[in-house]
Amino acid sequence: GDVYKRQAIKQTLQSQIRKYPATCGIKVNTSYNSSTGEITVNAALKSSEGGEYDLVYVLVTDGLTASGGNENSYDYTVKAISNNYLSMSTDGRFTVDANQEHTAATFSISNAKNLNPATSRVVVYALRKVDDAYMVDNITECSINGSIDYLYND
């Protein structure tokens, strides 16, 4: 169920980011319409070596959850996730040349009413095809009404 999915996503991201250095940067801007409960996400990707990529979004809200014993652990709840979260989509994937930018990724997240902008964020990560497997190449996060520019892992 959802808890398993959440754990799987976290573990996947953590293990893969350690193993493979990023080849791309991700730029995101978002706008939140609280009356319709819709978040529009525009994402762009710039690649240092080129390749086949796909962009995935996850809408999360932060919160404290009790975890065994009495200490609280920082956690987040996945509110929405695109269908391609562990393998590339057929229609969304794209190939980009080295040092080029792909700017056509726009996502619409609906049913996002009553979100607190202070604790809600959109996580966007890039999947890259490596040896017939899909690896998480880079990940960034942005508030639900904001923007984040390219950050490179040097």
What are these regions (language model features)?
Residues 1-154:
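Short, conserved sequence motifs used for protein processing/export or organelle targeting and
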